[in-house]
């Protein structure tokens, strides 16, 4: 469950401040990814952004009106647990059913691919097969990007972002991932929401979270 995390964050923050005698902030890694990209990456100059990381799960960060959406207890932005298949979905590790990350994470793609061919053991192998024109893999990718796009379309109708950022190891796949997601999201939302909407790959890769953590710390200190 997510709920003990706020207590854990406070405990870590207090312990580190006591040990080092310095101010400490604790933030969600996907939130930090989004902030890093806004500060010096692919989302510079944007005020309304949905950042999504695809990997073992789905992480996310939402910037609205130039401010990170954290919620009342700092738990906002858990996009992976947006329930896209609430009525008939598979079990999620959080205890609910039908969470988006069970369908949109890279691990969901790998699970589906492994049922077809054990050699497709990770994203790299799957995309290599897709680039070689394997029709089975291309069909799997089409179904997977459908799941990603449908979740994003719902969020677009709620937050009306100007930019959707896709992060994670697979985000380098422009033609096989980013472009299909962009087309499907725009086709799935009301026309006014699609106008001006961009979908881009994150630029900072593994550094995004660290860069965003610095930015989060600076913002927190400025508020205080």
Where are these regions (language model features)?
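General beta-strand structural signal in soluble alpha/beta enzymes
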Residues: 24-28
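Active-site glycine-centered loops adjacent to acidic/histidine catalytic or metal-binding residues
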Residues: 29, 55, 213
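Adenylate-forming
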Residues: 34-39, 60-62, 81-83
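Short glycine-aspartate micro-motif
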Residues: 49-53, 59-61, 91-93
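Catalytic-core segment of enzymes that process non-peptidic bonds
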Residues: 59, 63-70
């Amino acid at each position: 469950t997510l709920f003990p995390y706020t207590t854990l964050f406070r405990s870590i923050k207090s312990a580190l401040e006591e040990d080092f005698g310095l101010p400490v902030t604790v933030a969600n890694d996907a939130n930090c990814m989004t902030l890093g990209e806004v500060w010096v990456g692919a989302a510079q100059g944007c005020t309304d952004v949905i950042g999504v990381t695809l990997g073992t799960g789905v992480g996310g960060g939402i910037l609205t009106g130039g401010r990170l959406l954290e919620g009342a207890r700092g738990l906002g932005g858990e996009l992976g647990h947006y329930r896209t298949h609430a009525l008939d979905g598979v079990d999620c590790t959080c205890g609910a059913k039908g969470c988006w990350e069970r369908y949109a994470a890279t691990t969901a793609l790998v699970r589906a691919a492994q049922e077809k061919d054990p050699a497709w053991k990770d994203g790299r192998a799957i995309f290599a097969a897709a680039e070689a024109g394997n029709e089975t893999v291309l069909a799997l990718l089409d179904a997977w990007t459908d799941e990603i796009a449908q979740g994003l379309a719902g969020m677009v109708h709620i937050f009306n972002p100007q930019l959707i950022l896709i992060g994670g190891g697979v985000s380098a796949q422009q033609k096989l991932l980013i472009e299909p997601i962009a087309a499907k999201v725009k086709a799935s939302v009301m026309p006014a929401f699609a106008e001006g909407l961009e979908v881009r790959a994150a630029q900072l890769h593994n550094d995004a979270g660290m860069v965003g953590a610095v930015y989060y710390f600076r913002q927190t200190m400025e508020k205080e």
